[in-house]
A protein has these predicted regions:
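Hydrophobic, often amphipathic alpha-helical segments used for membrane interaction and targeting
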Residues: 1-97, 115-116, 128-130
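C-terminal structured interaction module
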Residues: 100-137
Length: 137
């Protein structure tokens, strides 16, 4: 989805900005507890189950269900997600306040960011499925 959204924005001549740089992404990965990563790899037999649950929640537009399916991933810790969500909020806020902006984030960030943006005075609604008809997944 990220790559397709990037292609659409480029094709339409839109300005594209990243909400974090490579070093910040690497720092997030470094913060993953090693045992959590090991447990995830040992649990590879359940990955098809997680994928199916994630797909079902995604297609149903079930944000809580979608967030629940990502908790198995090593990077889905409160510290990692919370720190990144605050960074995303700070960096997207000026553009959202200026208007005519779109911010794309992974599903693990949707619940926190929705609450944060509502605290900032934004009305947050589900995206119209028509947007996703342009994206080939």
């Amino acid at each position: 989805v990220d790559l397709e959204a990037w292609r659409i924005a480029q094709a339409e001549g839109k300005r594209i900005l990243a909400m974090e740089d490579i070093e910040e992404q690497i720092d997030a990965l470094r913060a993953v507890p090693v045992q959590r990563a090991v447990n995830f790899l040992k649990d590879c037999n359940n990955w098809p189950k997680y994928r199916k649950a994630n797909e079902k929640a995604y297609l149903a537009g079930d944000l809580l269900g979608l967030s629940g399916t990502t908790t198995e991933f090593p990077t889905r810790t409160g510290h990692i997600i919370g720190k990144r969500d605050q960074r995303f909020r700070e960096r997207m806020l000026p553009y959202l306040e200026a208007g005519n902006a779109l911010a794309l984030v992974g599903s693990a960030h949707l619940l926190n960011l929705r609450s944060m943006l509502e605290e900032d005075g934004f009305a947050v609604t589900a995206c119209n499925r028509g947007f996703f008809s342009k994206i080939k997944v």
